Structure formats: structure tokens, C-alpha cells
Amino acid sequence: AYTVFANLGSRVAPSAIVRVTDQSGAVLWEPRPFVESVLSREEAWIMNDMLRDVVRRGTAYGAVVANGGFRHPAGGKTGTTNEYSDVWFIGYTADIVAGVWSGFDRPKRIM
């Protein structure tokens, strides 16, 4: 879902293969992405602005500062479960979406 925001309202079907090249680097094949508009650019902009605030000054800000700062436009969402037994973050830039989860096999309070 977060890729739609990064792509300004367009859903692009993911591909595990970016491209196929020969030994000299010439591109032999690239996937033709399936693109579908699912949000207006304005709706995507609003979501990006809200999710960027999580990184700029919200609940993810401490992690950004603790790691020397992150100087790229990025957005994301933090979360915790009841009793703080799991914590997670889903973040994105224009190029990548990633998720991080921290928890235990058996419910145990982290914080």
C-alpha cells in the first residue's frame, strides 16, 4: 500500500527482477510494469505529507536522530501491539519500501 503514496497515486505491480543484462552491461530484458491509478495525486500528496511527519518530527524521529539523521525524503508509520510485545515500522522513499518488526516468539513486554 505504501508504494502507492511514493508513486503519487499509482499502483505499480512489483517485480522481483529489475533487469537482465549481458556481460558488458547491455540490457537484454526489463519487465514492463503494470501501472494503475488508484488515488489522485492530491490524495497521495496529503498521505505523503502526513507520513513524512512521522519521520521528520513524529514517532520515528528518535530513530532517525539516533542513527545520524536520514537526509532523503521518506515517510513511514510506527506501531506497537497491546502490552508492547511487538513494535514495527514501515517506511518508504521514492525508490524502496521496507518493514521492520521487533518482538519475541512468545508475547513478552519489550518496553
Show the residue positions of the predicted features.
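A penicillin-recognizing enzyme superfamily signal
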Residues: 2-111
